[in-house]
């Protein structure tokens, strides 16, 4: 595979040759054909990016050379095919690493299928059978689709909380505010519970990831505030679940990219097939 320096060198040489040829007495047709030949050579050498750049130059500099451009119609899909195959190789490597990381981390999680909920969720194994409603603290979870969320529970002191904060020597971060609605912000029997979803609470996950091991205070913000040390398990729940959610998101995006590249490769090959000229009858003899 060509590195960036090699690509820049080849591109510079190619463009210099083009400028030199433009200064001579060659016709536009001859100059356009020279670009086509250089693009073809770049494809043969495996420098697909250079080939695409040359073909773009052909199109912009010699738009009236229709015959030459038609003769080069097969080159662009060939270059795109080469580019796409390389992107697939890179994506496959990244996907393999991401999948290995996902599978390794999944050993620390359990899937909880609660019939009272619309869908189940992943949680660290230590909290697979926890009863968050009966304690003060937080619990991080992941949906089957990989969305990160945090549920807070406060029964030590009613403050009608609508947000959470984490504070340590590095600073302080907070979730978004979720106003009381009896659904995501729920109060019953002296217990206050809120579900914070995705971007509403990912700042907490990133904060703990950036400050591993630092003693941290959990703050319930509302009409009043209530502070308590963030327990080791609650911290582990947020840190590991946030990391797992990022891995699942990365894995999903890589799979989507792989599917896109497969489709792109097929389109390029279909175009190659349509633009490949059959040899003349005399050439077959």
Please identify what each model-predicted range represents.
Residues 18-21:
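C-terminal motif of bacterial Sec signal peptides marking the signal peptidase cleavage site
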Residues 32, 39, 70, 77, ...:
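Conserved small-residue packing positions in alpha-helical repeats and bundles
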Residues 36-39, 43-44:
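Hydrophobic/aromatic side-chain positions at a characteristic register within alpha-helices
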Residues 48-49:
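TPR-repeat structural position
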Residues 59-71:
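Short solvent-exposed coil/turn linkers within tandem alpha-helical repeat scaffolds
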Residues 76-106, 115-118:
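Alpha-helical linker/edge segments of TPR/alpha-solenoid repeat scaffolds
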Residues 188-202, 213-285:
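Internal interaction segment
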